[in-house]
Amino acid sequence: MLSKQIPLGIYEKALPAGECWLERLRLAKTLGFDFVEMSVDETDERLSRLDWSREQRLALVNAIVETGVRVPSMCLSAHRRFPLGSEDDAVRAQGLEIMRKAIQFAQDVGIRVIQLAGYDVYYQEANNETRRRFRDGLKESVEMASRAQVTLAMEIMDYPLMNSISKALGYAHYLNNPWFQLYPDIGNLSAWDNDVQMELQAGIGHIVAVHVKDTKPGVFKNVPFGEGVVDFERCFETLKQSGYCGPYLIEMWSETAEDPAAEVAKARDWVKARMAKAGMVEAA
């Protein structure tokens, strides 16, 4: 029988770096997490995962089976370097090839959701043409994802193009495809001048997962939980009351910390305490 408890996961970059997924999933299990979200970022090291051999992919699947800790989602931030909105045709083609490989990888290892970065371009100047190319790139990507039965989900970003659920819903309506949904980050959502609770309510029916982190205006990473502007309890209450029953993912970048496991355990306890206050989990 499937568990009715709320799935709580941890971001790969919160845990010690390395390529041994069996060790990573064992640690996540020890720390009490249900799943780990894989990162495929713009570094050559993590991009190379998309070229893993059949044996390497099977090793990941076997690690999931052995530990019981799932890897249901991928954070695909590689498109910062190879954006779908690039005016350089070669760069844009690389971006689409990364998307194709990511979808194939997801299909092979059982990843259900690929979180997309909502940048038309990142290191270049945006304009109407970059936005048009980005829209067209998303359309092509969703067609590939549909055939593979893999969901593409747009993150709410640290970037004006996609800094609210309302804006992301515009793309969902434009694409009009069940394999394109939303993956909001309540930290990013709170760092902008958004009515956060109204935005979360607007996204219900399209939200497939939620990133949990703290932020400050203009500061989107490495803000310790409780030191930023996010009203976690209200966000959790709103999502619960709106009928959201999906996973929550604690997003941290503690892989280079002196003791990543201790940092993660501290964050886990803090987040679960706020979830308990919101009536989502039993108090420890």
Curated annotation (Swiss-Prot):
Gene3D superfamilies: Divalent-metal-dependent TIM barrel enzymes. Keywords: Isomerase. Its EC number is 5.1.3.22. SUPFAM superfamilies: Xylose isomerase-like. Catalyzes the isomerization of L-xylulose-5-phosphate to L-ribulose-5-phosphate. Is involved in the anaerobic L-ascorbate utilization. Belongs to the L-ribulose-5-phosphate 3-epimerase family. This is L-ribulose-5-phosphate 3-epimerase UlaE.
